[in-house]
Amino acid sequence: KGGATLVKAARQLPYKLRIIGGGPLMDELKTLAAGTDIEFLGYKQWPEIKELVGCARFSVIPSEWYENNPLSVIEAQCLGTPVLGARIGGIPELIEEGKSGMLFESKNTVDLKTKIEAMFSHTFNYEALAKSSQERYSEDAYYQRLMNVYTGE
């Protein structure tokens, strides 16, 4: 889902990167990341993910597939963590540029590197992000939007 693009961009930067998850390309990614400050954490359960993502400066979603509504974006935002997401599928609809994160061109290592640097230099209001995301994605808010569709409002 864009792991190679992320690793290639991160190799050129002085920041520590922690990657959660795994898959059939993991060995290839580890080879690509050799000699860098990139740590592969493997699969994690939600309590660990919540702690890791909640403490992160920001989360990167380097998707190269058209995902309609990736939960990883919503989860990070609800934890107060800004998201740097690929401009593909439904991701741009979930990220308010400069407020809840930033976007980069999917599969574009140069743009991703530039946006990672921008994310580190940008100041986000983490508490406001968490609060607005929790309100936006709460059960009550979802129910109200669904009822508005049914009633034609």
What are these language model-derived features?
Residues G54-N68, T81:
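Acidic donor-binding loop of glycosyltransferase active sites
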Residues D27-P47, E51:
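Nucleotide-activated donor-binding/catalytic signature segment of Leloir-type glycosyltransferases, i.e.
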Residues V73-I74, I88-G98, M102-L103:
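Short acidic/histidine- and often glycine-rich active-site loop of Leloir-type glycosyltransferases
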Residues E97-G98, M102-T109, E117-T123:
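Conserved acidic donor-binding segment of nucleotide-sugar-dependent glycosyltransferases
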Residues K1-Q12, P24-D27, V110:
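A conserved mid-protein helix/loop that constitutes part of the nucleotide-sugar donor-binding site
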Residues E64, T81, G85-P92, S106-K107:
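Short glycine-rich donor-binding/catalytic loop of glycosyltransferases
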Residues S121-T151:
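A charged, aromatic-enriched C-terminal amphipathic alpha-helix characteristic of glycosyltransferases
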